[in-house]
Amino acid sequence: MMAKSVYKTVIFGAGQIGQMTARLLSSPCQLLCFADNDPHKHGSYIGNIPVCSPDAAAALLPDLVILGVLDEERRNSMIKQMENLGYHGPFRDPSVLRMFDARVAVMRLL
């Protein structure tokens, strides 16, 4: 079986980690949206990428969901939430961003 040429991707979490992940994302990922549990963010845009509810994101039938948080407990909760919404594809976490965690902490202080 051949690998997909483009992966329809959702980043779950529209905060700083999710946004940083989006900036580092490259092909073969097509970023469909940010999913977020904060209803005040729904309908807004980060750059040209829409922010929607997790159920709206699951309805887009993504091939991949990147979890835009570093906290393991929150990631596990997000995985369960997406699975309950019918998404059963792969999840990735932004573990590569752990090296930037100190920068994120400094950014929060600014």
Task: Indicate residue ranges for each PLM-predicted region.
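A short, basic/flexible loop-to-alpha-helix module at the beginning of a structural domain
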Residues: 1-2
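Glycine-rich adenosine-cofactor-binding loop
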Residues: 5-25
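A general structural motif
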Residues: 6-7, 31, 61-62
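Short, solvent-exposed amphipathic alpha-helical segments in soluble enzyme
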Residues: 24-30, 82-84
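Secondary-structure boundary/capping residues
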Residues: 30-31, 43
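Short internal beta-strands
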Residues: 32-37
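Phosphate-bearing ligand-interacting subdomains
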Residues: 39-110
